[in-house]
Amino acid sequence: MKICVIGTGTMGSGVVQAFAQANMPVVMKSRSQASLDKAVAKITKSLTKLVEKGKIAQDYMDATLANISTTTDYSAFADADLVIEAAVEEMGLKKEIFTELDKICKPETIFATNTSSLSITEVAACTSRPTQFIGMHFFNPAPVMKLVEVIKGQKTSDEVCTKIMELATAMGKTPVMVNEAPGFVVNRILIPMVNEGIGIYADGIASVEDIDNAMKLGANHPMGPLALGDLIGLDVCLAIMEVLYNEFGDDKYRPHPLLRKMVRAGLL
C-alpha cells in the first residue's frame, strides 16, 4: 500500500513517523524542501532519543528512517492508495488540497483528513469521490498515542471504513469508529473541559496549579485541563470550541473570553 501524508508540522511529521515505525513506507509532502528537511530532522531526533534510552535498537531506527521519502510535488501521489492530509485547521485550505488531489490521484485512492473537528462531509463534497473520503484523527504525539478516531462522513462507504480500521490496527493503534459529528468523540468532551478550566481561573476560583492538581488527583487525569490546553495549543482549542458553538448553537460550547484574549495576544 502506498501511503502519502501532506503536512510537516507536529501532526504531519508525527503521523509519518507512526507509519514508518510500523514498517509501512510513507511519502511526506510539503511545499518546500526546507520544511521537509526540518520534519525529517525532527523525526530523526525523536528516534535518536529512543535509541539513547534503550527503547529501540539502532537497526530499527535506521529501518524506520528508510521507510520515509519526501516530495514537494503532488505528481508523486498519482499512484497513492491512501492520502492523509494533516494541514492546518482551515476548511478553505483543506478543500483546496483535496480539489487538487482529486485531479491527480487514481480513482481508487482513499482520501483521509486528520482534522480534529471540521466536517468530513463538507471537505469530501469538493471531490468526485465522497464514498472514498474518511476522517483519520490521530492524537499528539502521534507515534505514542494509541487512539485513532476513524470518522465516517455522510457518504463514506463501509468498505473504506473497514480498510482504514484494519490499517490503524496494523499500525499498532486502537481505532474507534465514529459517525461524523462536531468534535467527534474526544474533542467534544475534552476541549469544553479545557474551556471550563480557563473559566474557573478567570473567575478567580482557583489558581492554575490548583485547578490542574484538582483534576489530576480528583479525577485521575494524567494532566490538568490548563496544562493540556497549553500542550494542544490554545489556538487549536479555540478553533474547536468555535466549531462546536457554531454547529450546536449551545452556550455550553461558547469559547470563554479569556481564551479568545490569550489567542489574540499570541499566548498559545
Feature annotation, model-predicted:
Residues 35, 49-110, 117-118:
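Rossmann-like NAD(P)-binding element
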Residues 22-24, 162, 169-180, 202-203, ...:
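NAD(P)-dependent Rossmann-like dehydrogenase/reductase catalytic/cofactor-binding core
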Residues 6, 29, 64, 71, ...:
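Structural motif
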Residues 1-49, 53, 69:
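NAD(P)+-binding Rossmann beta1-loop-alpha1 motif at the extreme N-terminus of oxidoreductases
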Residues 32, 57, 157, 206-210:
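Helix N-cap / loop-to-helix initiation motif
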Residues 110-180, 184-188:
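Rossmann-fold dinucleotide-binding core
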